[in-house]
Amino acid sequence: MKYYLIAGEASGDLHASHLISSLIKEDPQASFRFFGGDNMLQAAGSKGAMVRHYRDLAYMGFIPVLLHLPTILRGMKQCKADIMQWQPDCVIFVDYAGFNLNVAKYLRQQINNGKLNTKLYYYIAPKIWAWKEYRIKNFKRDIDEMFSILPFEKAFFENKHHYPILYVGNPTADEVREFLRPSRCSGEQASILLLPGSRRQEIKDNLPAMIEASAPFVNDYSITIAGAPGIEPEYYAPFIHNQEGIKIEFGKTYDLLSNATAALVTSGTATLETACFNVPQVVCYKTPFPALIRWAFNHIIKCKYISLVNLIADKEVVQELFADRFSVEAIRNELRNILPGGNARQQMLDDYQTVHKRLGNECAPDNAARIIVSLLSSSQKH
């Protein structure tokens, strides 16, 4: 069968590449065309063709999007025309809601007009539970099946909006399970791991406070910064200059997590990775205009928590020190609470079991691929 995939950023390219590999296992005759990146190209091999690289269209923020709007619109037009010409059995949208929902709306119109016979699937639901909830009408109107990688999204879509979706498993949990599968021995040395984010601004905002908060523990714990891929070591140098006992490691995040006693983590996927390794953590995220951000979070942003761990558990498993709660003293106090002997450590480890249970043991891309091939095979018989 013919599969057309659209991924508009690096994370989408990675997730889509795993899905392509799984689809090939389920459907050895599969062929692919896609808007995506190098990972998808490698996964598809001779079975695939990249129409356009995501870096040509990956603009974030109002001003960059506005400045590059002609390029983005040309990309949409090219994508629509290519799909109409190739006539795939299905189109699989991967996150990247702004671009993908525009294309999906057009394709649904062509399907309704009898000019296209294809199924429209969405792999990795956009986070409309936090922002732009009105987009639910687009999914109901245009998408045949939604595949989610976050278990709490099922209640949001189905209970609140009466829109059935499929939770297929979580890729982060998959990766941690795969990493832990070989017999690994945890190190004996007690350690505190600092995960200050993957973007320069995040690192600049969060790392100094993380270092200052953890410094009093340097005699009892080794303190290590997990360097982000794509950020050169020189960028970190000013932060650790004259800091006794603090080191930085690159390309070893999972090794470091598998041996960590506790962690300070900037919000994002890293919070879920840390929980999957059963490492107690404090979530730290410095923001501009703290009071304003807190007000917006309480009144505009439609979710109770910022960390995936708490969202999945639907309770405060880990402390979230962001906006007006972010301070060196607060981080230090919460870190002390989750170190051995601290009053919050065991409860957090117990609560992690709820997170593991809700994530399940399904391999997300394999599960999604099985369902997609089954749905397509079934639809072609009728």
Residues covered by each model-derived region:
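Nucleotide-activated sugar donor-binding and catalytic core shared by glycosyltransferases
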Residues: M1-H382
